[in-house]
Amino acid sequence: MREQFHRVIAIDGPAASGKSSVARGLARQLGFVYVNSGAIYRAITWHILQKKIHPEERERIADALQAADITCCLQDNESRILIDDVDPGEHLRDDCVNESVAGVSQFPVVRQIVAKKLHEHAQGHDLIVEGRDIGSVVFPDTPYKFYLNASPQVRLQRRAAQGGRDEIAIRDRVDSSRPVSPLVIAKDAHVIDTSHLTIQEVIEEIVGVLEKTGLRA
């Protein structure tokens, strides 16, 4: 039987393209639940590292996740991830997580778990989900797909302003070349270059597209 989902707005794009700020602001404006799929991958990566498992040990990662209790809850209309009742939120941008998340997230078992959690969320709530494969893989049937991008220079500046140390070029290469759920533009996605737009300008463009499709808060 086909899963029945509430309304899902997919916002995909590479690192530092503005996904998080736009998705969070749009969710607040529309009254949808905001979900950062990348935070789920980062939480899983943090959990794996806490278990002293190397990011390339696929079988041990699979076993650890099979034994883990991974749940999503809501806080201020935003999704939070708990693993074995622990909220790793403050550790999601730790250097060790930054260095390992791309490797951990490429494994099919990890992506399947994240997709399952997102599907469970969508069975009970209207969602705005940001990620890299939301419109292309996780929710391919949603009519509300957006892909945000920006120039490499702008993205580097944004990441530096956030105090991050992610290697943008390396992450792009890994995201785009992985065999499972690579970063691609869904064929029916609305593409927005955010390089010279404010967050609110991007939100307004998305709202305009949504209104043309008949979606209202």
Residue positions per predicted region:
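Extreme N-terminal, non-catalytic leader segments
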Residues: 1-8
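Hydrophobic anchor at the beta1->P-loop junction of P-loop NTPases
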Residues: 11
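Walker A (P-loop) phosphate-binding loop of P-loop NTPases
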Residues: 16
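Conserved lysine of the Walker
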Residues: 19
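Hydrophobic positions on the alpha1 helix immediately C-terminal to the Walker A/P-loop
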Residues: 22
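ATP-dependent small-molecule kinase phosphotransfer cores
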Residues: 39-126, 138, 153, 165-170, ...
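Conserved nucleotide-binding/hydrolysis micro-motifs of P-loop NTPases
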Residues: 40, 134-135, 149-157, 196-198
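Small-molecule kinase domains that catalyze NTP-dependent phosphoryl transfer to phosphate-bearing small molecules
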Residues: 73, 118-125, 132-141, 161-205
